[in-house]
Amino acid sequence: RRYLRTHEHGNTETSDLWDAIGAAVGDEPVRSLMDSSIWQPGFPLVRARVEGRELVLDQQRFGFDEATRSDPSIWQVPVHVRVGGAAERRLLLGAEPQRLALDDPAAVVVVNAGGHGFYRVAYDQALRERFTADALRGLTTIERYQLVDDAWNAVVAEQLAAASFLGLAERFTGEDNHAVWQALAAGLRGIGRLVEGDAHAALRQRIRDLVAPALGRVGWTPAAGEGPLTAKLRGLLVSVSAVLGGDVDAQRRCRELLAAADTDPASVHPELVATAINVVAATGDDTDYERFLGQFRRADTPQAQLRALYALAEFDSEVLVQRTCDL
């Protein structure tokens, strides 16, 4: 209201709005906070570690390469921190590290509590290990999602070992949220590209063990009245187990579902049909490729043609990938 009254029928600059908000809220440095977010590229990484009975927070620019990470840019970062079951604590992190006294130095620490901040978080190993399966149940959905997403991006940035991400992921056996599983799947898929041979076989087993509890809870058969996100979660879990986990039983069931859908499309839930197509293609051979290629060429609707084309892109064979590129 102050902003509208002051500049009624006039022209303004961006900073006029920040100044008006700052005047309304009092001592908060709104203008410097917003300027640091708008007038420089990138976004911050807030690093958290425990020293004695203190939580120490500092920042650097987040980046996937050393040149970006060494950028000296500093943001005014409003940070919400929750320690154990205590109320959230709010602070403004600038160039100097912030130290928070901890009543319980062994408590679970959640930086970016509530998930509202536009920054990534890097926990040191000691803090990361506190996110046990029990502790994860005390986090909100967005907090769990960001924990996984930040950890995987740290792996991509070569700031966290893939084994550490996998260890964190394995604590999510009680997870039933589709968005969180999407983040987990992205990381597991990426790790699968990094290993081969015996290590890849061991990774697949660990993925199957991770997915099995959640897939057991949601089941293969859609329940009456279930929501669309439950159906999407089922499809995602089946795909992760069958493709990333190499679950031969899941692969077999997907082939059976696809055969049933070919005979009677209404007999299989659309999400399971889409999943079955993905799984059969990702684990398929030349015969499967020819099947989807025929469907692509004979499709009588744009939707059916796209579905077949997407299936062709899932095949792993270098020769088949090249055939798809040459279409």
Placement of each model-derived feature along the sequence:
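Non-catalytic accessory/interaction domains
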Residues: 2-327
